[in-house]
Every structure is written in C-alpha cells, then in structure tokens.
Amino acid sequence: MHAASREALAKVSSDLDAALAADNTMAVAAQAGTELFDVVDILDGDRALRVAVADSSKDAHSRVGLIEAVFGGKVSPSVLEVLKDAAEQTWSTPREFRAGLVQLGRRALLRSAEKQGQLGQVEDELFRLSRILDRESKLTQLLSDRTQEIGGRRDLLAKVLYGKVTAVTEALALQAIGRPEHNPIDDIAALAGAVAELQGRSVAHVVTAVELNEGQQQALAEKLGRIYGRAMSIHSEVDTSLLGGMIIRVGDEVIDGSTSGKLERLRASFA
C-alpha cells in the first residue's frame, strides 16, 4: 500500500477496534467481519461502484453519501459506520480501498476469535492449511482456477475444511480464495503471520527432519525469544531431505543447522 492508504487503514482500523471493544461481544465482531467481506464481494462485481467510493477527486461527503445510499439497511449500523469512515479517508487507489476493507474484515474476525480465546488455534490452523495446499498441488490448482466461478471454488474448500477448523479460520480461508491478485498458499500463510502479530509475536519458520513435539516447539520459541528479544511463534514443517537438524527463518535471516546444509558446506570447502 502507498502512504496515503496505509494512513487511511490505520485510522479506520483504530476506529474499528474501538467500536468492537465498546460492544465486547464475539457475535458482533464475527458479524462485522462477515459483512465487510460481503461488501468486498459486491465491490468486486461492480467496477464503477468500486472506483466511485474511493474516488479522491470527489469530496468526502459525496463518497460517504454513496456508501449510505448503496449499503444503508443492507449491513449492520456498526459496519455502515466503518464503511462511511473508510470512504471519508483518502486512498491512493480503488484497489487499495478494496484491500483495506479486506484487512478490516479480517481484523474483525480475528477480534471475534480473540474474544473466544481462539487466536492461537486460528494461527495454527491457517499455517497448517497453507502447508496442506503447498503439498496438494491439484487442490491448489482447482482453488486458483480463475476460469471457474469464485462460489464453486469456495464451496470446494468449504467441503475440505468442514468440521476440521474453527468458524473464523474457515471464513478467512474462504475469503482468501476469492482474491485474484494473490496466491492462496502465500495469502493464507501471511494470514497466519498476521494472527501471530496480533498476539504480539514474530514468526519463526522452522523446517526440521523430524516433527517437533509441543515441548520442543515451546523450548525453541523461548530460545529464539531470548535471541531476538521478542515473543516468537513457531511455524514448523517436516522435510526429511534435511537428514537431521533444522533450518530457521526469522524475517530475512536464515539459520541453517541442518545435516544436509552442513554436508553441503563441507563439500564446498573441498571444492
């Protein structure tokens, strides 16, 4: 996002948090997230409306009036206020206005998970889903096929997820499938990282030769926390080709302690 859009999103996000905190119920936050996603779908199907509600050449009053005319009575009063607040801001492009609404919808759903004490579970489910999609290339291809209707692709993923994840995880994942400018694997993995950030944690991506148990993950999180000076979430996966040890990535920094990596460095030293 450009600077103006980042500023607009920060303002509306703060207002959204305040509104959800004032109500303090999980159901209201979940409804807000769902309705914001519904609004995004409407904007996706109406380019003229998408451009008009974020047209910076028009005054804010006109944009807010358009929001009221289109969505008044169709969404809850609290979501209508969020939409009016968003329309009042200056966004760099209509695309970034739409992206901002996606972020707001996600934020509302995550606040509902927070009120239920499910943030950690949602984070883990999203990360696991991103790894499943990475392994199941046929499924990912079907979910990414833009020649097929979004509704059909979402129905397919809903069948895969049914009864296996929280309602918040399912809602977030289904919405991600409809984002044509994003790879669903990367988008869902980034969502898991956003959940960690909401909990005040940074993410350590860990690849190991054998699966880490819960105690080992906790010990690794504590050790990395001491190294980096902040709380850490461990997103781990198994790659038997490492032979042993692990590879850790935190941001742009990579620590290769795998057996295969050590052997490769040893071979290079004799070259």
Curated annotation (Swiss-Prot):
Pfam families: OSCP. Signal peptide: none annotated. InterPro entries: ATPase_OSCP/d_CS, ATPase_OSCP/dsu. Keywords: ATP synthesis, Cell membrane, CF(1), Hydrogen ion transport, Ion transport, Membrane, Transport. One of its GO terms (cellular component) is plasma membrane. One of its GO terms (molecular function) is proton-transporting ATP synthase activity, rotational mechanism. Its main location: membrane. It is found in: Cell membrane. The keyword Ion transport applies. It is a peripheral membrane protein. PROSITE patterns: ATPASE_DELTA. Belongs to the ATPase delta chain family. F(1)F(0) ATP synthase produces ATP from ADP in the presence of a proton or sodium gradient. F-type ATPases consist of two structural domains, F(1) containing the extramembraneous catalytic core and F(0) containing the membrane proton channel, linked together by a central stalk and a peripheral stalk. During catalysis, ATP synthesis in the catalytic domain of F(1) is coupled via a rotary mechanism of the central stalk subunits to proton translocation. PANTHER family: ATP SYNTHASE DELTA CHAIN. F-type ATPases have 2 components, F(1) - the catalytic core - and F(0) - the membrane proton channel. F(1) has five subunits: alpha(3), beta(3), gamma(1), delta(1), epsilon(1). F(0) has three main subunits: a(1), b(2) and c(10-14). The alpha and beta chains form an alternating ring which encloses part of the gamma chain. F(1) is attached to F(0) by a central stalk formed by the gamma and epsilon chains, while a peripheral stalk is formed by the delta and b chains. This is ATP synthase subunit delta. It comes from Corynebacterium glutamicum (strain ATCC 13032 / DSM 20300 / JCM 1318 / BCRC 11384 / CCUG 27702 / LMG 3730 / NBRC 12168 / NCIMB 10025 / NRRL B-2784 / 534). The lineage of its organism: Bacteria, Bacillati, Actinomycetota, Actinomycetes, Mycobacteriales.
